[in-house]
């Protein structure tokens, strides 16, 4: 993943990613909105120009390598503290490259490998998050982190049958620091 602040640096960015096709995302986008697959350099430039023309608040744009073998599939891991409490595979239902459930994708429970679990916890820690949704895909090079969400949705509970709210509450209870109260009466 690389960041772009303007459309003039596209050549350098594409070189860092190994060329096209690339995924271009508005950093502030959610639910698969503001995400485009640019299959050529010309298309990437056009998308970036359009994003920056409508991007008055200066939000960054992210560019990511398009991993063909993912075939519209990614994995969401729900991390609480130092463990993954639920995980699901998300698959697009049509030819869309986005597997986001809000774009019509379907989810199924999935078991992660030890390597994947460790990577997800490490990704959440790198972002200084104790509760996070880590999105990644399996590739020929191993698991690749796509993004780390600071406020992941709870739809994963329905899909996996796993309770994620309780581990969050338990984590907070274990880690909440108690501060001594100062008695204001008679002070």
Regions found by a protein language model. Name each.
Residues 3, 79-80, 138:
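Generic beta-strand structural signal
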Residues 22, 62, 86, 132, ...:
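Protein kinase-like catalytic core scaffold
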Residues 96-145, 166-185:
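A long amphipathic alpha-helix within ATP-dependent nucleotide-binding catalytic cores
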Residues 1-33:
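A conserved helix-loop-beta module that forms one wall/lid of the active-site cleft
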Residues 31-123, 127:
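Phosphate-binding site of ATP-dependent enzymes
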Residues 77-79, 142-156:
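A short beta-strand motif that forms the metal-chelation/ATP-contact edge
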Residues 94-102, 154-163:
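A short, polar/charged loop-to-alpha-helix boundary motif
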Residues 29, 82, 139-142:
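Short strand-connecting beta-turns/loops that link adjacent beta-strands
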């Amino acid at each position: 993943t690389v960041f772009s602040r303007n459309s003039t640096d596209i050549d350098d960015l594409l070189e860092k990613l190994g060329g096209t096709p690339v995924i271009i995302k508005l950093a502030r986008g959610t639910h698969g909105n503001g995400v485009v697959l640019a299959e050529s350099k010309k298309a990437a430039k056009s998308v970036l120009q359009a994003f920056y023309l409508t991007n008055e608040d200066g939000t960054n744009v992210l560019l990511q390598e398009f991993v063909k073998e993912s075939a519209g599939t990614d994995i969401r891991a729900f991390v609480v503290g130092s463990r993954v409490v639920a995980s699901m595979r998300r698959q697009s239902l049509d030819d869309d490259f986005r597997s986001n459930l809000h774009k019509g994708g379907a989810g199924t429970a999935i078991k992660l490998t030890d390597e994947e679990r460790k990577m997800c916890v490490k990704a959440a820690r790198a972002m200084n998050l104790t509760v996070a949704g880590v999105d990644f895909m399996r590739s020929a090079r191993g698991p690749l982190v796509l993004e780390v969400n600071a406020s992941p949705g709870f739809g994963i509970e329905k899909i996996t049958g796993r309770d994620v709210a309780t581990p969050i509450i338990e984590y907070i209870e274990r880690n909440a620091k108690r501060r001594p109260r100062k008695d204001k009466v008679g002070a």
